[in-house]
Amino acid sequence: MDEMRTEIRISVRALVEFILREGDLDSRTTGKTDLLAMQAGGRLHRKIQRRMGAGYQAEVSLKTRVSMGEFDCVVEGRADGIFAEDGLVYIDEIKGVYRDLNLIGQPVGVHLAQALCYACIYAEREELPEIGVQLTYGNLETEELKYFRETRTREELREWFFGLMKEY
């Protein structure tokens, strides 16, 4: 008789924030309320997603199950966007900030980790040998955009993701 395995569910965002525990580009540092920042962020997300055109899949649900010995961990979330360019599929993670984008020299670690999780889940599901990751930062007041891109192999992502899961 099969015994029921304990299942733990966690969002991609909660997972990376728990493991990496680092500072964030936080809209609250300017005195803006969380609600206003969330509303502005939602508007910016939708605007960017519409601008990307018909080939851009917005708000794609992704989920994976990882056996962790005595229990299973279900990691799930929603990629802001998925698109293909020059034969490479990209996971797009959009972040709205109240900060001068010129001061952002590289992606915030938790933002990159979130995108890498989605990239790993999607590359595994679609059996892609490699996948692109794009972080799109948008200033919530000016709507100026800044992009960071990188490419990873499925094997690199798998190794990184399972290392993250071991820490969890």
Language model: regions and residue ranges:
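Conserved catalytic cores of phosphodiester-cleaving nucleases, focusing on short active-site segments
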Residues: H45, G77-I104, Y118
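Metal-dependent nuclease catalytic cores that hydrolyze phosphodiester bonds in DNA/RNA
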Residues: M1-G87
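Active-site oxyanion-binding pockets that recognize sulfate/phosphate
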Residues: D34, L101-V108
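ATP-dependent helicase/translocase motor core
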Residues: L128-Y168
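Acidic-residue sensor for enzyme active/binding pockets
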Residues: E59, E93, Q114
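Long, low-complexity, compositionally biased intrinsically disordered regions
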Residues: E22-G23, S27, T33-A37, C73, ...
